[in-house]
UniProtKB/Swiss-Prot annotation:
GO terms for biological process: detection of chemical stimulus involved in sensory perception; detection of chemical stimulus involved in sensory perception of smell; sensory perception of sound. Pfam families: IR75A_N, Lig_chan. Keywords: Cell membrane, Cell projection, Glycoprotein, Membrane, Olfaction, Receptor, Sensory transduction, Transmembrane, Transmembrane helix. Disruption phenotype: Severely reduced response to acetic and propionic acid. SUPFAM superfamilies: Periplasmic binding protein-like II. Glycans are attached at residues 61, 112, 126, 144, 166, 232. Belongs to the glutamate-gated ion channel (TC 1.A.10.1) family. This is Ionotropic receptor 75a. It comes from Drosophila melanogaster (Fruit fly). Residues 1-335, 396-402, 614-629 are extracellular.
Length: 629
């Protein structure tokens, strides 16, 4: 055996693979092992390789192979196996049972078997598509100092789902005691990446877990597939159909077949049952329907790419009595401004009375007023000017007219600013409810209905948020006997439209379509929206140890880069309601006018009371004069 040349080949292979740790399973004699190790200690490449020798002779049981011989913390560990040894068959079978022909181990299987003999040996082994296995056939050349090593790439698209062993020649190396050279390529593998050469899964049938919530599972598989394949009524099971169409694109890219496993929920608990449970227990290879990446699920699954967005909201129209506000006409100015404005008007009223008094006493008779107005009359003139009212009394003096000019100028400025603020506030947007959080909603008196979705029920059962517990206690437990607590999306949206104050909880990707169908543009702007649960992303999941992880990730990234994903998402998923309030006239409702009418009624009552007091006082005063002449 040409051990020096073999050591040089192994070292060169490790350098090309960027690996610094190797375990060598062999059946050499002690002096041969020493010779091989000495060549490793004085390598032709300036690198340090950690190596460990395992003598296969005398090993009777290869159980717990990975734990006993391959414990490491490196990204990849190289493993050399001498196929000519008698114990090789048992070792390779145990590696197949433990499923360690994967990307974490760089296998070098060295022997002189023909490709057909190697195929018969490895054909029954569980080798994965991400396997890094090389079969190396050595052949001593004529000069006896150089050895040719033909390297073959070995992988399987999936033994348990119909895949066949693939052995493809890669290249040939020629090694002498000093150096190794690549002499020729045996195929075109070097032109593409590892997964570029393995992207065609033509011989396997992938098992895909799919959720269907809007059709009974008693239907045949063909009927369910036909439903998921339809492109109309995008609001019905939109998330499941969105994921299904992405999976069909993946199928076309991989040129494979798929067997769909249908379920009516994502999971019964976090990782048990449903489509998620099928991937966890490895009865499915992939989830077509995106799901949440929770902490519990990530112990068993890997999220390979974002393929969705989850948003549940509570919508309701503002109740008619919720917008009644007594201070709507006082809002343009703060209390301090109102006090100062009233003080200025009072001061001007006093100045006007002084002006009229001086004019009556000091001016010439022809310029005098017929009578001296009272202080109350001048106050009335001042406050009337603030309301853009004229006056029948006009000062004759220049000073008095300057006071009038200042009064009307101040009133004009204040009035225009006041009316602009009031009108803009009344005509800008309708009254919105003050309910902005789930806690406020739970503490309100509003009636609640929910869309009967599996993940909504699961969230109510497993959420640890205190506001959700309060919501369940106040809104759910009190309606356990109410058959209308759980309503389909269409009925729930219609009830929101017809009953202001009714709250409906639904998933936006499907529910928004009904809102856009049954609500006018103005009614959409009137809606209040409260986030039912934190917004979360949906991911396509594989099992944590899936051998298809990297291949599927690359294919999904390709779908994302080409814009196909964005096109599908915009078609299937509705994430936002569009309010175009500037395109229509908003009517001012009673919620704004009622405070004004209330103030007018109160003023009328006050006037009547004052009138009655004045009449009573006059009557009393008249009687008093009659009895005391």
């Amino acid at each position: 055996m040409q051990l020096v040349q073999l050591a040089n080949f192994v070292l060169d292979n490790l350098v090309q693979s960027r690996i610094g740790f190797i375990v060598l399973f062999h059946c050499w004699q002690s002096d041969e092992s020493l010779k091989f190790a000495q060549q490793f200690m004085k390598p032709i490449h300036p690198i340090l390789v950690y190596h460990q020798f395992v003598q296969m002779r005398g090993v009777l049981n290869w159980s717990h192979l990975e734990l006993s011989y391959m414990g490491h913390t490196q990204p990849t560990l190289a493993i050399y196996v001498d196929i000519k040894c008698d114990q090789t068959q048992d070792l390779l079978e145990e590696a197949s049972r433990e499923q360690i022909y994967n990307q974490h181990y760089h296998w070098l299987l060295v022997g002189n078997q023909s490709k057909l003999e190697f195929y018969d040996l490895f054909g029954l082994f569980n080798i994965s598509i991400d396997a890094d296995v090389s079969y190396v056939k050595e052949q001593i050349q004529d000069n006896n100092d150089s050895v040719a090593y033909a390297v073959h790439d070995v992988y399987n698209n999936g033994k348990i789902i119909g895949g066949q062993l693939n052995v493809t020649g890669s290249h040939e190396m020629s090694c002498d005691p000093f150096v190794c050279r690549r002499t020729r390529h045996l195929s075109s593998l070097q032109k593409r990446s590892k997964y570029g050469n393995r992207e065609q899964l033509t011989d396997v049938v992938l098992r895909v877990a799919t959720v269907v919530t809007q059709r009974p599972l008693t239907l045949s598989d063909d009927e369910l597939i036909r439903f998921l394949s339809q492109e109309n009524d995008t609001h019905i099971d939109s998330l499941a159909r969105f994921g299904f169409h992405l999976t069909l694109i993946l199928r076309d890219l991989l040129h494979c077949k798929m067997k769909f496993i249908f379920s009516d929920s994502w999971s019964k608990s976090d990782v048990v049952g449903g489509s998620v449970g099928a991937v966890v227990d490895q009865t499915a290879d992939l989830t077509a329907t995106p799901s949440l990446a929770t902490e519990g699920r990530l112990k068993y699954l890997s999220a390979i790419i974002e393929t969705g967005f989850f948003r549940s909201v509570c919508i309701f129209r503002t109740p008619h009595n919720a917008g009644l506000r007594g201070d709507v006409f006082l809002q343009p100015f703060s209390p301090l401004v109102w006090y100062l404005f009233g003080g200025v008007l009072s001061l001007i009223g006093v100045l006007l009375w002084i002006t009229f008094y001086m004019e009556c006493k000091r001016m010439q008779k022809r310029w005098r007023l017929d009578y001296l107005p009272s202080l109350l009359s001048t106050f009335l003139i001042s406050f009337g000017a603030a309301c853009i009212q004229s006056s029948s009394l006009i000062p004759r003096s220049a000073g008095g007219r300057l006071i009038y000019f200042a009064l009307f100028l101040i009133s004009f400025i204040m009035y225009n600013y006041y009316t602009s603020v009031v009108v803009s506030s009344l005509l800008s947007s309708p009254v919105k409810s003050k309910i902005k959080t789930m806690r406020q909603l739970a503490e309100s008196s509003l009636t609640v209905g929910l869309e009967p979705l599996p993940f909504t029920k699961s969230y109510l059962n497993y959420s640890r948020l205190p506001e959700i517990h309060l919501f369940i206690k106040r809104k759910i437990e009190s309606q356990t006997q109410n058959p209308e607590l759980w309503l389909p999306a269409e009925q729930g949206v219609l009830r929101v439209r017809d009953n202001p104050g009714y709250v409906y909880v639904f998933e936006t990707s499907s529910g928004y379509a009904y809102v856009e169908r049954y609500f006018t543009a103005q009614e959409i702007c009137d809606l209040n929206e409260v986030l039912f649960r934190p917004e979360q992303l949906f991911y396509t999941h594989l099992h944590r140890n899936s051998t298809y992880k990297e291949l599927f990730r690359l294919r999904f990234l390709r779908i994302l880069e080409t814009g196909v994903y964005r096109k599908q998402r915009s078609y299937w998923v509705h994430m936002k309601l569009h309010c175009v309030a500037q395109n229509f006239v908003i009517t001012v409702g009673m919620e704004y006018v009622a405070p004004l009418l209330l103030m007018l009624i109160c003023a009328d009552i006050l006037v009547v009371v004052i009138l009655l007091v004045e009449l009573a006082w006059k009557r009393f005063f008249t009687r008093h004069l009659t009895f005391h002449p």
